[in-house]
Regions:
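Short acidic active-site motifs
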Residues: 23, 27, 47-50, 146-150, ...
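Extracytoplasmic ligand/sensor domains, especially the bilobed periplasmic-binding protein
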Residues: 22, 33-138, 186-211
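Internal alpha/beta domain cores that form substrate/cofactor-binding pockets in large enzymes
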Residues: 134-135, 150-153, 157, 170-187, ...
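Signal peptide-proximal N-terminal region
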Residues: 1-12, 128-132
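Residues that mark the start of a beta-strand
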Residues: 11, 104-107, 160-161
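Hydrophobic alpha-helical
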Residues: 45-56, 146, 159-181
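Short, well-structured alpha-helical segments in soluble
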Residues: 14, 18-37, 96-100, 145-158
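A structural preference for short, hydrophobic beta-strand core positions in alpha/beta folds
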Residues: 12-14, 136-137
Length: 211
């Protein structure tokens, strides 16, 4: 808008991956026919994994802005880059944070997506190496409207800290229902919970103190 880049005019094209791997693959194939030079996106690891080979084989540079799965940069794709830390790095930070907060018995909950499961596994390994007991490791099903069952299982494990590695819609609902059941255990999330909608779903009181 202000004259382009290096004296070249830049045209911006958009596609919506819908947060779905199949849709992302179709969108990547459409963009690959448009003579583009670079793509910024996508956000989720499973979404990126469905599209990165298409862009690489077409000679298109891809810069992912929120895809943290380790394997995305272990494939040797010369045109793939990202601007976020990998799951192994986030796992180290999560462990350091949990130790700093003094937790001794940690529950880890993920949602079976590439991102969430990868971060959960890295965090579990780091916590065990740091001699922090992991008393619960399981997954919920994304998109459900009631997580009382998994919260009951979590509570039965008697953790003093819960690390949820999934996304903000589920995190918000977990926080709300945790408060409704009168359970005050501290909760922490990964980078995918960084969205104002989490507070809207949980309610300000339930979101208070969430890490």
């Amino acid at each position: 808008q202000q004259g382009g880049v290096l004296s070249k005019k830049i045209e911006i094209l958009t596609e919506d991956d819908g947060g779905d791997p199949r849709t992302a693959s179709l969108a990547a194939n459409r963009l690959a026919t448009r003579s583009i030079v670079a793509v910024v996106g996508t956000y989720g690891s499973s979404i990126t994994e469905a599209s990165q080979n298409i862009y690489d084989e077409s000679g298109i540079v891809q810069v992912a802005n929120g895809s943290t799965a380790i394997r995305l940069t272990e494939k040797g794709l010369k045109n793939f880059f990202r601007t976020c830390p990998r799951d192994d790095e986030q796992g180290k930070v999560a462990t350091a944070t949990i130790q700093k907060l003094g937790a001794k018995k940690v529950a880890i909950l993920h949602d079976n997506t590439s991102y969430a499961k990868g971060l959960a596994e890295e965090s579990q390994a780091n916590l065990k190496a740091a001699n922090v007991e992991v008393v619960f490791f399981d997954a919920l099903t994304p998109g459900e409207r009631d997580y009382n069952a998994i919260l009951t299982k979590l509570k039965a494990a008697n953790p003093d800290f819960v690390f949820f590695t999934g996304y903000y819609p589920e995190a918000g609902l977990l926080l709300r229902q945790k408060k409704e059941m009168g359970w005050n255990v501290p909760f922490m999330g990964g980078d995918a919970v960084n969205n104002p909608a989490l507070v809207e779903t949980a309610g300000a009181a339930a979101a208070e103190g969430f890490y």
